[in-house]
């Protein structure tokens, strides 16, 4: 049995799940009666984790956004980690959304502070886009996971490599 256990807190999302959610949204877009005859598309820029919603009506653009968010939730991606970049209008309305897939330094410091304030017998350290938490008991690590989830940060947090 290991004398120390650890896990990583990461902001990474599963890119395949994001693709699957957007594909499901496209299928629903094709089958929805209220969106028939309206030009609407969903485009994904994988390198920048940005997706673009394009629709010929601003009201339908909001419907399209709701469809995408519902599909993301069903796929286990936290919608709080999605930031609206900008809205463009012209012949078509466009909405650019960015999926945060990293923990920024401010959020990492908040998480680290919450872990230290919990007075559990664990140590945490910020390692780039991840936070490593080390402790002797798995119960303490599970308590840390619960504390971090209760922080309600606008991130897609995932807990990896529990050893």
Curated annotation (Swiss-Prot):
Keywords: Nucleotide-binding. GO terms for molecular function: nucleotide binding. It holds the Pfam family DUF520. The keyword Nucleotide-binding applies. GO terms for cellular component: cytosol. The keyword Transport does not apply. Nucleotide-binding protein. Belongs to the YajQ family. PANTHER family: UPF0234 PROTEIN YAJQ. This is Nucleotide-binding protein Cla_1551.
